[in-house]
C-alpha cells in the first residue's frame, strides 16, 4: 500500500473518485462531495475534517502556541 492510499484511508476519502474543477477544488463523481485543497499558506491556521460520502465537511481554526506548536 502506498503513502497516498494510507493518507486517503486515514482521512476517510478512499471511497471518493475526485475530479478537478474550478482551479483548486475537486468534486466526487459518485456523490458530488466537494473537496477544497487549501493554498500552502492556509495550512498553518486551518484544519479540515472530512467524513465519508454522505458526511459533512467541517473547518476549524487552530490556535498556535508560543513555542511554534499547534493546539
From Swiss-Prot:
Domain of life of the source: Viruses
Protein name listed in UniProt: Uncharacterized 8.5 kDa protein in GP2-GP6 intergenic region
Organism: Bacillus phage SPP1 (Bacteriophage SPP1)
